Amino acid sequence: ILNTILTNESIDVIVGNINKVLKVIKGSSFLIENNSHCIKWPGSKIAENKFSNSICRKTESKIILDIPNMLADARNFGFDPKKYIKGLDVDSVSMIHIAGGDWLDGYKENKITRGHFKKVEEEVWDLLQDVFLHHVPRYVTLERSRNINIEEIIDELKKLRTICH
């Protein structure tokens, strides 16, 4: 979900847009992914996980939970990432993205994570384990776009397999 004001009015607009797409692409499903944000829009009235839940319920869509993005937002805006995960509807999380990257300066003191070119940090692994306590995603994607180190990736895939099974 792009950085938007988290209100019921925004939900209505997004739901309408998703339903238009689904009418054209019949028989398809729709996935929404959380982004990391440098700012929180004034006027937001709903927590992002509740916002996503509402969209999913109204459109039968599912969530791609990008754990590094969620972790960036938790650090930036002071919420508990485990409560965020637990607050997502049980059957809503279809896919997980994990990656390692750099923490970059965002707006004011806030940080964003960018890049898929480093090892996954331990806090992301811990949160992935927490996801599996509450959800059964169909897919987990380990993202790596450069600094390809085969041994490192194999180790991460082994760790991923252990967590997922």
Positions of the model-derived regions?
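Active-site acidic/histidine proton-transfer and metal-coordination neighborhood
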Residues: I1-K62
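Gly/Pro-rich active-site loop or hairpin
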Residues: I5-I11, D73-V136
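Hydrophobic faces of well-ordered beta-strands that scaffold small-molecule active sites
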Residues: F30-E33, I63-L65, S94-I98, R138-L142
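Active-site beta-loop-alpha junctions enriched in small/polar residues
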Residues: N35-H37, P68-A72, A99-W103, S145-N147
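Distinct, well-ordered alpha-helical segments
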Residues: K40-R57, D73-K86, I153-I154
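Long hydrophobic alpha-helical segments typical of transmembrane helices together
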Residues: L127-E151
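C-terminal helical cap(s) of enzyme catalytic domains, especially alpha/beta-barrels
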Residues: N147-H165
